[in-house]
Amino acid sequence: MVGWKADPAILKEFNPKMLFWGGGHKPHGSDFLVTAVESSNFQIPALEKMEFFVQMQSTMTPTTEYADIILPARDWMWEEKNVVNGGGGYGGFQAINYCAGVVPPAGEVRSYVWVFTKLAEKLGVDPKTYFKYYTTDENWDQDWERYQQDNYQMVTDYYAKRNIEVPSWEEFSHGKFINCDELDAEPFTGFDDQIKGGKPFRTQSGKIEFFSRYVADEANRGKGEHFDRSGRLIDNLAGDWGSLTPHAVYRKAVKGMDDPRTRQYPLMVMAPHARYRVHYLFWEQPWLRNHVYQHRVWISPADAVTRGGIKDGDLVLVYNERGKLVMPAYVTGRLMPGLIVIRHGGKYMPDANGVDFGASASTIMGGDFESCITPAHATTLVQLEKYQGEAP
């Protein structure tokens, strides 16, 4: 297996023949033509180089359409049963709840974890090494529930140490959820042990450090895995970190307004997440399309006037060297001139000439590999004009 942390020398000789794209256990995580960091038009030739492409999905996505074999997967929200901890990292309240599923799995459809467990077995690996709760295929649902119960037990143990009672597993799995914020006498703040209690940070100085001694040491470059001085994995550092410096420095944005390419592509694109989707997920939901949410490119009145008097609802062509897309315009004074907005997660729907009429922001994104930590997938430079053709 070769990934982004691999020795660069391996990658130069890497010539893959087969791709199994599972994308984890969440459906929106495996539509990579829309959600990955490279342009859709540049990913497709890479897919077509594969002699064999297997895609595991719960919905038919643009990526899935390129697969040689499609394996149906249980949907993690509607068909699986999962303990979910979420909310806090996305600006909401921190909560722990149980997704019990709302429909039974169709036919013999299996979960991602079952498939990976069986793959491990076929490769000669003890399946319990991958999923320790596994006993037999017939007992899979019971094995999975034991796994979820153990996950929840960690929650109850955590609160028991603080003398806080939480719902039993039986109550929790039948609808009660935990609002973590309500269980704390005071709002949660990070690093209380260090800042309020005087406990040293796990750094060389024991204080917050703004300089990475690890990155400064060139002997560490090229390793497959990186660990800090206390043995913790640095899981977001690539094998070769390129021009990354050990301390923060200002750099001009790649494909930003300081880029000389603005002479050819004078508009900067922002691609925020839509309120009505999770990445690509829910694009196919008619209740959230047209009536509630309309997938349009936002453009300022000043930029609309200088481009032939573009009006609300006019079809426009957005393009750069990465690709072309066509979508309706939304003219609004909420944007400054020189900036347009296309929401992330639109469906990639190219015509015979490669023009994307689903208007996925990924079509025009990509090509920025300056940062090995966070390849930018939120901004780029484009030109925009009235579309003169007909929609397919």
Place the predicted regions along the sequence by residue.
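Extended redox/cofactor-interaction regions of prokaryotic respiratory oxidoreductases
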Residues: 1-66, 75, 81-82, 172-307
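Short, solvent-exposed loop/turn segments at the edges of secondary structure
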Residues: 14, 65-66, 90-98, 377
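Short beta-alpha connecting loops at secondary-structure transitions
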Residues: 78-84, 94-105
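Long, contiguous, secondary-structure-rich segments that constitute the structural scaffold
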Residues: 100-170, 282-392
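Hydrophobic alpha-helical scaffolding
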Residues: 9, 32-33, 85, 89, ...
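Acidic, Ser/Thr-rich peripheral helices and adjacent loops at domain boundaries
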Residues: 72-86, 332
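Short strand-coil-strand connectors
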Residues: 94, 204, 263, 319-323
